[in-house]
Amino acid sequence: MRYTSTRDKNVGVTSAWAIAQGISADGGLFVPVEIPKLSLEDIAAMADMSYVERAKRVLALYLTDFTPEELAYCVEGAYGDNKFSSEDIAPIHELRAGEEILELWRGPTCAFKDMALQMLPRLMTVSVRKTVGTRETVILVATSGDTGKAALEGFKDVEGTKILVFYPDEGVSPMQKLQMTTQEGGNVSVCAIKGNFDDAQT
């Protein structure tokens, strides 16, 4: 599958290139040239799959330049090893008849951002390896809350990556500060800055 830029439809890159670059050189976002179509039978077949199996199936439609082994590394690394407090990863909980909620807080930091940030580092390392070789990827993050801890936890000890999170010293809760400053991992760092979130971004 090819990806194009929201600012220039003549751009055409692989999914690995889009992930490794983050944004297009023209400042646009990468989007799929076309959205894969699933039949009702395809959707029904996924209903009984585990979250991990379903994720591999859906990602294979969008990341066509990834091998099954690479997809397994990304998905199983993100959602395996009891990282989530439910084996369903994102279970649906019935409140009462006809009312259900999707629980997106079952990840290691109890933030919905765990859903993406547990997989992103693995997608990035595979994508960088496929496009530019074995370079180390350094991620700089600015946060005013949950993103920092979720990003640190996601990138923790993922080979080929380092992450540095900036946060406003007076702009996060005491709990969030403790979560970030006590983060384990050999490739993670945090830095408090004087100022607000906008200052952290610059």
Question: Which residues are covered by each model-predicted region?
Answer:
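PLP-dependent amino-acid enzyme catalytic core
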Residues: 1-202
